[in-house]
């Protein structure tokens, strides 16, 4: 109502988000979905990291870790984010593409089934239930660092040693990065948020000017299953970060500082990873 010509929104709820987008479009504003797709929405463009690729990285990271940590018979619990979140659906597509062939071949065994959630206490409860019912579980695909952290703490209290029980993560949180350095998490998917913000800003300038953004910016599409349409998308490349690549990624980008990362018992691990703390 105050003359905005472009609306950028990150919809936590697709039903509410779709209503907002319908209102914006009716008042002449172009809508950009930011980071998360509004299912059933009327946005013109979507800006995010390639979320299927995020899932691919999680799956491949687990596979690499299983080999590096010498887990000879991986019995894997696959965990998911909230099923109402389209990003969680895309992450799942990505890591199932990596893991399902291994399950089918018998190289890996899928054990248990946990309800999807983004709530860490609920994720821990789901893991505990599955771990109690299936004591052979020795690797977990967790979709983000926040869900992984309480599971790692639980396993540590159970006496699980470093580099014996592969666990994955996403978002490059401080705790997640520290768990990686300590040898309790395989790696994390890092999404440089400044690139996402820059892409949204660039797209906004084209829309405000009434111009069609170039293919060098809008480089893909994302399917909206509610409307059965492909949404023109800016899809950015996520990165898999391990202890060996922290210095060249999250530290270089100042996403976290060495001082934040390398306190106490992690000083030796930071020196080993060539992170000056």
Predicted region positions:
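A residue-level marker of the well-folded mature domains of exported/periplasmic proteins
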Residues: 1-277
